[in-house]
């Protein structure tokens, strides 16, 4: 199964913010126990690179990627640490070009036709749509998908257990991203059983 197939199969790509490296593996295992075996560890905190390494080395069943990547240096470091895919909040010609050149799956943030056309130039077929609830949600993605046949979206922002099925049922959605299945407060408190249940609930709601 390819990385893109794994992301679609997981349905949810948790956006994980970690303050401590030692929380990485328990978080990954808790989500995997809930049926979510992918995770996007964001580069919003200093421990992100080592957290990615920890998951890559200790949780082979989990597909770990790096999020909030805004330059090539971060992308290179993330991949060196074991990230299997890259997610960026916006479109960076340099980041996308480096990922394509190195055969690393990448989902750049694109919310306008111009950004999507720049992404398509690199042969990509999936974009991050962020923040989805600000830029028009499903209706916006539906309209954007009309001229860009075959394009898939990874929406993040405003997706939750209450509306995940509506998103996943749309033919132009590849998977959804979000942090609601792995709240930062629950990670910090070690509420692993709660995180497992949140993942189970989200997957059940998507069916």
Model-derived features: positions:
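Mobile acidic interaction elements
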Residues: 29, 34, 121, 128-129, ...
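Conserved N-terminal beta1-alpha1 strand-loop-helix module at the mouth
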Residues: 1-81, 101, 150, 161, ...
């Amino acid at each position: 199964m390819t990385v893109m197939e794994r992301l679609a199969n997981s349905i949810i790509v948790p956006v994980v913010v970690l303050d401590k490296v030692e929380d990485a593996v328990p978080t990954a295992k808790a989500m995997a126990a809930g049926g979510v075996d992918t995770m996007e560890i964001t580069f919003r905190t200093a421990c992100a690179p080592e957290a990615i390494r920890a998951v890559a080395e200790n949780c082979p069943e989990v597909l770990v990627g790096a999020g909030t990547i805004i330059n090539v240096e971060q992308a290179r470091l993330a991949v060196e640490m074991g990230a299997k895919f890259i997610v960026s909040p916006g479109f960076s010609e340099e980041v996308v070009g480096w990922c394509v050149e190195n055969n690393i799956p990448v989902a750049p943030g694109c919310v306008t036709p111009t950004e999507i056309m720049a992404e398509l130039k690199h042969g990509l077929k999936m974009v991050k749509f962020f923040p989805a609830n600000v830029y028009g949600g499903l209706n916006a993605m539906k309209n954007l998908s009309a001229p860009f046949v075959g394009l898939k979206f990874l929406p993040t922002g405003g997706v939750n257990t209450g509306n995940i099925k509506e998103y996943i049922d749309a033919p132009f959605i590849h998977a959804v991203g979000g942090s609601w299945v792995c709240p930062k407060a629950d990670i910090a408190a070690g509420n692993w059983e709660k995180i497992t249940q949140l993942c189970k609930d989200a997957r059940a709601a998507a069916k």
